[in-house]
Amino acid sequence: MRYKMGRVLTACSVVMVLLVSWNMGSVRASSLPHRVFILHSYEAGHVCGQPQHDGVVAALRKAGFKEEENLEIEAYFMDTKRKNNTPELIDEQARLALGKIRDFRPSVLVTLDDNAFRTVALQLVDSDIPVVFSGMNGQPEDYNQKTPWLESRPHPGHNITGVYEKLHIADALKIHSRLLPGVKKVWVFVDPSPTGRAISKQIKLEMEQESVPCSWEMKIATTWEEYQKEIRSANADPEAGAIYPAALLLKDGEGHSYTAPDILAWTVQNSKKPEIALNYAFTRMGLFGGAAVDFHAMGSQAGQMAALVLKGGAPGAIPIEDAQRYALVFNLNRSKELGIQIPADILMAADDIVSAKP
């Protein structure tokens, strides 16, 4: 009898140990940190990428996902503007990024800007890695023609969702025309890179959808020298009331690359027209300003989507959104250089006023 009782107690002990072990494993699994991989198209600290990154992290924190508590973040910078800007180098960066992503095994991948989405996210369609994009300039439907990943913007339907970078250029021209009522024409400058072509299409689409109080002319600068020549031509055009510099990658005759900091610094030194800023942060680089894309807010939108995925939501059921917010920002030092007096009511409505030189 004692022998049988001992066997029963031993069996019960084994069951208890197994139950406790299973329960501890469940607790351990639930407390494991969520893993978010943020893939940048550009270099660390880039004027477009870094604000989006910060917005993603801030939104995750607000949703309860905090580093060193329940969140692990890894980032990789493809550096496809300044350094790795040929098709071969971009493809090599995509290969390296995919390897790092698969090793990290993220709960969600966040891609910032088009090159990361185009070369990496589209290779992960219908994989077990959820993807949230931010800063997409290309049309989602155009990417879908290359690799099917999208049923519709309201219901993407696969494992990808995100934020389309609406430029709000029509709003920018309306505000500038109110600021300077005599504006007849705005010169828009773009470059022929993949992102530049996408921005060109965005501008045309947005202008078709809304009426603006002035005319506009698009110039595609294929080289650094051509860009310089076109800026000087705009200076000489009496009808040009402003320029919209959206050429962010140019090469000179010797193959040297010029990116946003180089291009905008030269523009501020040589342009005689107020510059409408595409990016909120461009005013801190010396541009006049106006209504500009708020990249931090756009990243925050993407971060909110990533938080939904971490909480169990399916990316395919989360609607793709336009970047909702533009910021009204002005550089007072630049306005003084140009001899422009910004009305008090517009300054009071501004989200930010920059007074320091870049």
Regions found by a protein language model. Give the residues of each.
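Short hydrophobic alpha-helices and adjacent helix-cap/hinge residues
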Residues: R2-C12, W22-P358
